[in-house]
Amino acid sequence: MVLAHPERVEALIVQDAVAHNEGLGANWKTRRAFWADRVPNESALRTNLLSLATTRARHVGDDPNVERHDPDLWTDEFYFLNQPGQAEIQSDLFYDYRTNVDAYPKWQAWMREKQPPLLVIWGKYESSFDSGEPERYRKDVPKAEIHVVDGGHFALDTAADQIAALVQGFVGSSREGGVARRAG
C-alpha cells in the first residue's frame, strides 16, 4: 500500500515483520530454494511450512516458558492448514511472498524518503526471522520506536496488553505529529 497509495499512510506499526532481506535469516533456506525453483522444492517447503513443529514454532519460538502459550492456537492453525486444498493454497501464497522480498528495497527507499512515524514491536522469542531485524528499521527511519516484548512471532499470544499499550501510546503521541485516527 505504501507504494501504491503513499498518501494513505500516516504512520507504520510493524509487529514481527521483515522489510530487509537479511531479516529472513537461515530458517529461510528451504523457502528460498522453493522461490528459485518451485516444482522440485515444493514438497520440502510443504513439509517444513505445514508441519506441526513449524506451526508450533511460529507461536512459541524459543520461549523457555512454553506453558505461557495456549496450545489451541497452534493446534487449531495446524488443523486448518492441513484441510483439503490448503497445501496448494499455502504453497501459492508462499510462492507469491517472494514478490514482497523483491519489493524490500522499494519499501526501504520509501521509509528513508518519507520518515514516517514508525513503531516496531518484536517478540524476543521470534524464530521465523532474524533477531537483528528491528534495528534494521532504524537504518531507514532513525527515529523509529522499537520495543522487544516477551513473546514469539505471534507476540500477541502472550503480550497483548503490553502491545495494546504501546500502540495506544504511539498513536496518541504520533497524533500530535500528524497522525490522526480516521473516523469509522
Model segments located where?
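Flexible "cap/lid" subdomain of the alpha/beta-hydrolase fold that forms the substrate-access gate
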Residues: 2-147
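Catalytic active-site module of serine/aspartate enzymes centered on a nucleophile-bearing elbow/loop
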Residues: 143-184
